[in-house]
Amino acid sequence: MSDPRPGTERPYRTDDEWSRAVFAHRTGAAAAFLAPYLRQGMRLIDCGCGPGSITVDLARAVAPGEAIGIDLRENAVRQARVLARERGIANVVLQAASVYQLPYVDSSFDAAFASAVLQHLASPVAALKELRRVLKPGGVIGIADGSSTTTFRYPTNPFLQAWDRLRGLEREYNTGRPSETLALRALLREAGFARTQASGILVTEAGPPAGSLDETRVVARNHVIRLRGVLGELAVAQGWATREELEQMAEALIAWGEHPDAFYARPGFTAIGWA
């Protein structure tokens, strides 16, 4: 399996408005597949914690054990600290760090979690090896990723299909490799996790599949934010689309979000491994 040099990926750029909208709906439910293996008193690390909306719920699950959330982005870590204070979560530590070089000694965690992280890395196996290093023998890891190449959208048209293709192009541009979300068990095994299991779910960027007018409006709005923001800028710079084509996609997304029969989901994949 191809695994480029760690750290060669381009950073995944997001719009602040998009981040606020999406992470407002990301909670501990995203780690439900790992929940049966968590116990009070465990020490847990959440890699790529973002603004902490999942991390604070994981901290509750392992209290009085410690939950540590790391993210490369200092701004995200600051937001996570604010959220933890607002919710009165005292057993969480949040800091800027790279999953490729975790600032922790070997065998220092009982559990690890990473959601929507591996898909943005040039070398997911290197990251998983580093997580395995800090897990105690028998420690558990849960990873989750969504497909960047497959979506289920109804109704559709060429402008919406072009938008979905743009997101796949962005992923490959950033990581230098094709999506491997179907290969989570293989990635875990290559990283040294001998026992693994995996499952599939349907998700949107903000939780379950969108099948009501309120939900499809939210999905359309979030997609348009990216289209008219950093992803649109990248698409023009790379020659993937013209500004006129981007606006046609945006208008198609808005119209789709208002359609009485609209539906949207994409495959999500989860996997668990034991060190």
PLM feature spans:
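Class I SAM-dependent methyltransferase SAM/SAH-binding core
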Residues: 6, 45-47, 51-101
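A short acidic, Gly/Pro-enriched loop at the edge of an enzyme's catalytic core
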Residues: 100-111
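C-terminal helical/coil "lid" or tail adjacent to the Rossmann-like core of SAM-dependent
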Residues: 16, 199-263
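Class I SAM-dependent methyltransferase Rossmann-like catalytic core
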Residues: 2-26
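Conserved alpha-helix/loop element of class I SAM-dependent methyltransferases that forms part
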Residues: 24-42, 57, 61
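Conserved catalytic/acceptor-binding region of the Class I
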Residues: 142-221, 225
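A short SAM/SAH-binding and catalytic strip from SAM-dependent methyltransferases
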Residues: 110-124
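A short glycine-rich, Lys/Arg-flanked "PGG" loop and its adjoining helix->strand segment in the class I
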Residues: 125-140
